[in-house]
């Protein structure tokens, strides 16, 4: 078993729902934080984030919804989030144009090297 500490950024270019992270099929991810920033100079933007549970017919569970004020950031997962193989995180924002950006910090537990 290998544990790799990683970061992955995202930008919301449109207003549709976007998958910003998918846990690999041979691993488990422990998400430490998902920082989300509104880079707009003057307007608040509504942001939604969902956990997509691959073991439950890809049912989506909202874990974050907030009107982010202009030029602010927030940790959308202050208690962390655990993802199993195939689980995903989606983001949707009321405004596109890369105004909403973020960073996912996580530990990826790779099980491909296990015996048995």
What are these regions (language model features)?
Residues 38-46, 94-100:
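Extended, low-complexity, turn-rich repeat/linker tracts enriched in Gly/Pro/Ser/Thr and Asp/Glu
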Residues 45-50, 58:
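A short, structured beta-strand/loop element
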Residues 1-29, 93-116:
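C-terminal interaction-tip segments
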Residues 37, 50-54, 92:
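A generic structural motif
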Residues 55-88, 94:
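Intrinsically disordered, low-complexity Pro/Gly/Ser/Thr-rich segments with frequent PxxP/GP/PP motifs
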């Amino acid at each position: 078993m290998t544990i790799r500490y990683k970061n992955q950024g995202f930008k919301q270019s449109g207003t549709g729902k976007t998958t910003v992270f998918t846990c690999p099929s041979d691993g488990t991810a422990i998400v430490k934080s998902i920082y989300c920033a509104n880079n707009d100079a003057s307007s608040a933007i509504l942001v939604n984030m969902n956990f997509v549970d691959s073991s439950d017919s890809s049912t989506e569970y909202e874990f974050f919804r907030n009107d982010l004020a202009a030029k602010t950031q927030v940790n959308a997962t202050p208690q962390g989030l655990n993802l199993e193989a195939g689980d995903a995180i989606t983001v949707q924002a009321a405004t596109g144009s890369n105004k909403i950006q973020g960073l996912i910090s996580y530990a990826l537990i790779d099980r491909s090297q296990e015996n048995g």
